[in-house]
Amino acid sequence: MLPGFGATQTVSPFPNPPEYASAYTSDRIDNGSAPPPPHPLTEFKVFGEEYRLEEDVIAPLSTAGVEQYYVDKNNWKAEMKKLNRXIGAFFDLLEVLIRAPDHPARDKKMVDLHTIFINMHHLINEFRPVQARDSVRILQERQIDELTEICDDFREYLAHGREVVEDQFKMITGKLPPPPPPSDLTRVRMQNGALHRLIEVEKETEEDEEMKEDDEEKPSTSSSEGNQKTLRDMTKGHGPPSVVNLLARQLNEMELKK
């Protein structure tokens, strides 16, 4: 068995902190004995090309040994027009080539044209940060317009929703309209206390039964007349036939009990 494979090894899922972390404990930070942070990097390489933060993003032409024809790089429009007019030296070169191809001025004119195009290309590169800032500005303005439109739509939807909720709240908490009056077919009129009248008739019937021993015919006649009068009183409100029949049936049952 290979050494080290027999015993169980504990492996941390995270790497150990760097050694300089021990110099920045809470106690040392509170006491002020912690070392100062390292200085930020001012020089670095990207894809093999060196960059320095103190220098301009685009190095001047003098660092490359090229003569700079423009003076003010901030006024790039005017400088670009000057360089564009300087391309007229190309016609001088053509004239030299036509008249004296071996004249030493030929090389000078070719160098001038080469330098002019390098200056134009460099001036365009100087304008790249300005172009980038304008592109970001235009992008942000478009995003602001889109967000403003979205916020306006949300406000419109919110106002519409509030109107709907307020209308529903008024319908719930407001005073409800009175119910419509019942029709003639469903109207029930129990005038003069019909139920109370039935109870009184039943009591009168019980009293008549007690007085039956004295006079059998008279109570029967008076009770029958009283029941008919009660029926007329209860049905004079023109109630539904079902209610009238129910009351008449109860009175008939009371008559049969006698």
Curated annotation (Swiss-Prot):
Domain of life, source organism: Eukaryota
Biased composition (Polar residues): 220-229
Membrane spanning stretches: none
Claim: Nucleus is one of the keywords in the record: yes
Biased composition annotated in UniProt, kind: Acidic residues: 203-217
Compartment(s): Nucleus
Gene Ontology cellular component annotations, sorted alphabetically: core mediator complex; mediator complex
Family label: Belongs to the Mediator complex subunit 7 family.
Listed name of the protein: Mediator of RNA polymerase II transcription subunit 7
Provenance organism: Caenorhabditis briggsae
